[in-house]
Structures are given as structure tokens and as C-alpha cells.
Amino acid sequence: PYEGEHPWADVPRDQLRPEYKSVYQQCLKLYMDHMREKGWADKIVLYISDEPHFSHEHIRVQMKALCTMIQEVEPDMPIYSSSWRHCPDWNGAITVWGAGSYGCFPEEVLRERAAAGDRFWFTTDGQMCTDTPYCAIERLLPHYCFKYDVEAYEFWGINWLTYDPWK
């Protein structure tokens, strides 16, 4: 998405290549026009990033640039990231937060962001493994959704295969 070659070490991450932006935005617009024609647009959530490393400045800047690019053509597009925690830099960019279900996304921030119009899903992953202290917490997810007014949970790994099932 940037000028030059990967890994773009010295490239400002908020300056997406104009050609990249143009092609992405055209594709997104065509896709969403199709979804609107079919009556499905209200069922779309754009999953932009899985567990972004927002402790790095370049990741925070890049995410905002990508979300801005999307919102320029689809301002009402829900943008989801399984961020686990809150990243204040992304307020207004991420509109559907993937919050950790075990307290790493503070409840008061969840309430503040919800009041600002953001939506929430609980995200799951490694803490669901059988050898962790959170074993079987998935049984509480429907209750957590009800208690915290969270609309869904992303259950990672339901079809993750580490082998070829056809062999």
C-alpha cells in the first residue's frame, strides 16, 4: 500500500499510495453496491485486522489510514478488529471492537465507546485452550454478551486446520 519495497521501514504509514487507495476504494464501492442491490448491506462487517500489535506506533498510524480510506467511500461501514484491548488512537476508526472477555478491555471504556456509537463483540483465542485457567469460559460468553450488551462473540478456531483433511 506504500511507495517503495516491503517492509517499508522508513515510509510514513499514514500516506497510502494513491493507486492503492483508488483501486481499494473502487473495489469496496462495487462490492457494497452489489450488497445494497441484494439487500444484504446491513449484514456486512469489514474485518480489518486480527490482533493488531498496536503497541507499535506504525501499526496505530497505518490502521487509522486504512480505516479513513474505507470511511471515505463507505462512511457507515462497520469496521471490526479483534484488538482485545482498547486503543484510544482508533476511536472513530474502529467501530466494532473485538474485546477480550476476561477483563482486558475496561468496562468503563466499553460503556464510553458504546455511548459514542461503537459496537462490541467478544473475541476468543488462546485463553480457551485446555491447559489454561480460563478453560470452559466459553460457556459464559452468552451471559457476558447479555450483561455487557455485547452483540456477538467471535469464536476463533472453529475450523482452523493444521493439516490437510483430504489426505
Located regions from the model:
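Catalytic-core regions of glycoside hydrolase
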Residues: 1-166
